[in-house]
Amino acid sequence: VPGANMPADAQSALDSLVTARVMSETVPGAVYVVFTADGPVFSGSAGVAGGDGRRPCPDTAFRIASCTKSFTAAAVLRLRDAGVLSLDDPVAKFIDIGPCELPGAQSAPQTATIGALLAMSGGLATDNPWADRQESMSEYEFTALCRRGFTLTSAPGTRYEYSNLGYALLGRVIRQASGASYREYVTDSLLRPLGLSHSAFDAAQCTAPGGVTVGFHRVGDQWRPAAVSTPGAFSSIGGLYMTANELAAWCSWLAAGYPWGAIGDDVLAASSRREMQQLHQLDPVRVQGQVRAGGYGYGLEVELHDCGVVVSHRGGYPGFSAQMAWHPETQLGVVILENASYAQTPAVTALRHVLAAAGLPTRSALWPATIAARDEVERLLARWDDAVADRLFADNVDLDLPRQHRRAEIVSAAMRIGFCEECRHRPLASCEPTSTSPANLEWTVTGQRGELRCAITLTSVNPPKVQSITLSSKGSDCQQDRDGGR
């Protein structure tokens, strides 16, 4: 979605969203950035960044809280790609961990693997209130904590449960595997090579042009500055300070893993960035009575919305809230940073506003063979030709419906709407096309007396051929053939 084509009402909607959160005293201040693969498109802010009344801007640093986990995951995958570790390695290969107990289990559970911790399926309890106060824990104290062992909620690798402790363990794995501290490795291997020069784990080292925001928490009817934790053994769960512009640049780079051959492979391969954005542990959620598919990737949440797959992560920390979200198919995304504790920042809601305003393109670029097949189908509608059918159809088509019956159906449908040679060659964009894959297409066929919907799916065997074709009255469902029905 080119930024130049973004409707003005998209920015108006987001301005209203963040302004309403400040006016309702949900947060003292907020800033957002809308971005595409080409960089920021527009931004806005509301409220204050600190007690001096200054307004936050896209170059003001906030704590991004658990959005930091995407950096932790990327660091692990970078070490994996270098051959230093495997996601199948037990965490105990790198960390001295005491006994792990699963109450009620008949045998001692196995130690979680690195991959299980990345996907939030390490069997550790959800621990937000406790873990958010542990960032400054020393490495010595963390070593002692690990040696005491852990009580598990499930066998590692069997189900989703969000655990900050799991990502603190990954921070230690990075330290042991790389020979550098977690913060040094992320800074030297991810932040600096990507030009994220204003980001830091320590507010005192953050060089954001717009300064560093003061974090607040609510006490009665007043905002009070929140205590600031310093870097330590739990920095890998949520310790980064970033500007909205730099977090948007990070998200844009992650999303750019989708066009094969994307830039930045020297920092982390595009295939590994795509791996972060795949669903590795299912966690269906119920929203307004409806179950929505989703779960956890590696350091990122992955959910299926009505607009398609959305990748995101929310962050909540004493004094700060954050959310980043993007739509991989269009690489259009939103970052929102706020300076209030656990404010449930609404970046996914903002992204839906932007997608609705921009209009969604076809989900995937069609194969040339799919576009050519549409022309051949309309050629058959205008005048049946067995030679055209022979080169168009895969070998299953005549087995699924004998040729004479298929011909009769197509000829009858064409006569019903008055389709002829003069009706062909309408631009595809004017035919209400929809697609869920490069290999399928549904579009409207318009004749002299009416319209119908046509849906085709192609095989992957070269040369791709049509394996199913469905003609239906406009407004009826063509979906069954695309899902495997006949």
Language model features: what each stretch is:
Residues 7-64, 84, 100-104, 139, ...:
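Short, conserved catalytic-motif segment at the N-terminal edge
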Residues 117-118, 145-149, 276, 354:
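A generic structural signal for nonpolar/aromatic side chains embedded in well-ordered alpha-helices
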Residues 43, 76, 91, 96-99, ...:
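Short, solvent-exposed secondary-structure junction/capping segments
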Residues 387-435:
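Short solvent-exposed beta->alpha transition segments
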Residues 13-15, 29, 54, 58, ...:
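Active-site helix/loop module of the DD-peptidase/beta-lactamase fold
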Residues 1-45, 175, 180, 184-188, ...:
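Catalytic loop of the DD-peptidase/beta-lactamase superfamily, centered on the K-T-G motif
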Residues 158-162:
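Cytochrome P450
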Residues 72:
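Active/ligand-binding-proximal structured segments within catalytic/core domains
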